[in-house]
Amino acid sequence: MEERLDLPRLLVAAPASGSGKTTVTCALLRAFQRRGLDPCAFKCGPDYIDPMFHREVLGLPSRNLDLFFSGEDQARALLSSAGRGRGVAVLEGVMGCYDGVGGTERASSWHLARTTGTPILLVVRPQGAALTLAAMVQGLARFRSPGMIGGLLLNGCSRGLAELLTPMLQRETGLPVLGWLPQLPDCAIASRHLGLLTPGEVQGLAEKVDRLASQMEETVDLEGVLALARSAAPLPAADRARAKIGRAHV
């Protein structure tokens, strides 16, 4: 019988870029770190800047899981190898949940979640919509099978709006709303036309991440987030040697 690895994990995805995936990922990593969970981080796709932020938070490397340049077996092996001995893993998605290569879902956040058996925490910005949010979330949850979205997090949201939207979204979508984060302009991780600034260009990054994690401890059900992470399917327990073997597409 093949050895399996139980690695609690979740993938932070969103309907589109600019929803706050990196902010939420970094805040979760710090919050889990405070709880002594020894977290590790991964990035969907080849992007190198987001992993720099993960490393800045954790003090250890974040790894890329790219289903275009490597196959599904190697992605699972890399996740298993790097996650061995860790208490929880946070995978940061790319663009919108289903945005992959050439207008398909190939190598998308959803593709990686499906391949690795990782539940998705969907980050949603609720500005300018109410019930329509439920229609959007429901569409995302059902767009491809299997549906990998296991919970929602409202980002850039006031307490009053969160109290209004949470029961409605849960009733209409059947998905738990695991919390909310308010707009914290002084904690924003700035971006530019070619993407995020690098960590060295963000003044006071450690303090910003600390404040975001403290806010998350107040307004996000971290036990619920961990329960979602613990629902992840077991992984093949690949050793480090196997994780380095595989075909790459260049």
Cite the ranges covered by each PLM segment.
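Conserved small/polar residues in nucleotide/adenosyl-binding loops
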Residues: 248-250
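Short, low-complexity, intrinsically disordered N-terminal peptides in bacterial proteins
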Residues: 1-10, 236-246
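ATP-dependent carboxylate-amine ligase catalytic core
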Residues: 2-19, 23-116, 124-151, 159-164, ...
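Internal gly/pro-rich beta-alpha loop/helix module
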Residues: 130-244
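Short hydrophobic alpha-helical runs that function as membrane-insertion/retention elements
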Residues: 120-123, 178-180
